């Protein structure tokens, strides 16, 4: 009984908040009746406002402009509203209709993610709420416009002015247009994705040139992350991969037909810019890594490898790269720095098919099919790049770089060389192959090994003008060195003989003496300085000295021929007058030729290969021309002398058989061949038609010319034998040999 009041009170409390259907009150259709504390009342449904009895008006939620958020349209309906994304936008779930209370919002649709959205020969540019299509250079729509949207039925077709890409003004205009279009992009990843996406499709010549310029102009942005923090491993790898694939798109084999349309100097300019930018950006990206790392990427026509390490790991780091059957390795001067801390980045790039683009031929597509093209140097290997960036710069200094590269094709009949692409950052249009600072250590038919003292882009060159194989070339080099050393010794003995033996002094020995002096100096300078090509000024001076001394030697050979002719024919001459003119002709005329040549083309003295005259603009003929003239004169004199001597010998000694006369004349003729320099005719033949036979004949006969002169003028001369006998007769070790 005591609990009854509590139950009654609790029941009353429940009735105050209990709602039930109305029985007396009538509400509008958009309202509902509810009972509260025993009182009936009408309430408008959600989305309506009013008293529920006489009025229930729809609430216009769309009157608040921001109710659906950005890039959305609000649509009011009875009792509510719906949000619709504008064209070009959608929610994260891919829907176009939503209500904001579920957390959805509209974001831009990247229509350009579908590569074919604009059709062939077009580039897609994504913008907020849509996209635009641009025809590539050389193409336009039927209306002549370059910009369009595909839903209007437009597409890109070849322009009537499709040769515009060959004009500098057209190239510059397209570059400026593209720079203006992507100029607002200030984020590294976005810019890289934009360039990569546009390089994926089939590229025209204008596309290649334009985006190489974009890469060059944007190298500072591409090489640095979007914030001050370092790269995470995943971001570092993905960024380098995407950058490497972008470079690969510009140099892959399918683009070679486009590159062929550019003149050689323009082709080299843009390739130099591309290689320089690739090297620079790769180093910059790698400098922002968080820790010691290594990265590898291998695409169809480009391979990339990066080493990043700090000073504590230097002694364990061995930067190297295996490339297409080859190998490249960097050796630093020191592998550990005492008390110095810092970071080091080493980057290798291998361009697998870029070689033909950098060959000396104007039409490399045809040249690659012709192994016998004259006057060309062809790249027969991959082109590799090696670069170092250390902080501080002295932390990791280069001692040498060694590499072995496989040949693209066999080169058993050609000479190979180690070369690097020599260019200046301020003058990239002057890029060319050079051998300075590089040394060939080994070569066979399939591979060549090199050692260089600097870093840049390296390759193996094949000289297609040479018909001499590597083995023959090495043998000829050794023969030349040995022959010149022996000749120098023999010429020194000849000079001593003709200078100090008073009993044999005559006009003839004076000529012999000057010939031997000129030839001795020429061969000495050749032996010491022919390969000193590291310093252009020194190399030019050596080339000038060689030019003068060899011409002087030829001049005295000519004097030998003229003097012998005068003796044989029996012309009476004034010795004093003749001596004076001999010296003028022997030493002054070569000086005039060299001085005149130097005034016209001093830059042609010394080449990147050897310190000799350049073949450019036929400058080599400033030596070959006078030499050929002297050889011709001496050949005529040689013929007359042999004829006169043979007839004279046969007339004086009729009892001597014809065979003996011929034998005597043959021995004299052989002596004259070397004395008059007529053996140089083999050199002329080798220039006209190079062959292994002419190479060996020229090398042996002229490298040993000093030895032959010593044999015929000294050893086989009775007068000089007597002088040697008198000189050495009191020397016990020599007397027995001279008896």
From Swiss-Prot:
InterPro entries: EGF-like_Ca-bd_dom, EGF-like_dom, EGF-type_Asp/Asn_hydroxyl_site, EGF_Ca-bd_CS, GAIN_B, GAIN_dom_N, GAIN_dom_sf, GPCR_2-like_7TM
Signal sequence extent: 1-19
Spans traversing the lipid bilayer: 482-502, 514-534, 549-569, 582-602, 623-643, 668-688, 696-716
Positions in the Cytoplasmic compartment: 503-513, 570-581, 644-667, 717-739
Ranges for domain EGF-like: 20-57, 58-107, 108-157
Family label: Belongs to the G-protein coupled receptor 2 family. Adhesion G-protein coupled receptor (ADGR) subfamily.
Described purpose of this protein according to its UniProt entry: Endothelial orphan receptor that acts as a key regulator of angiogenesis.
Name of the protein in its database record: Adhesion G protein-coupled receptor L4
Organism for this UniProt entry: Mus musculus
Upper classification of the organism: Eukaryota, Metazoa, Chordata, Craniata, Vertebrata
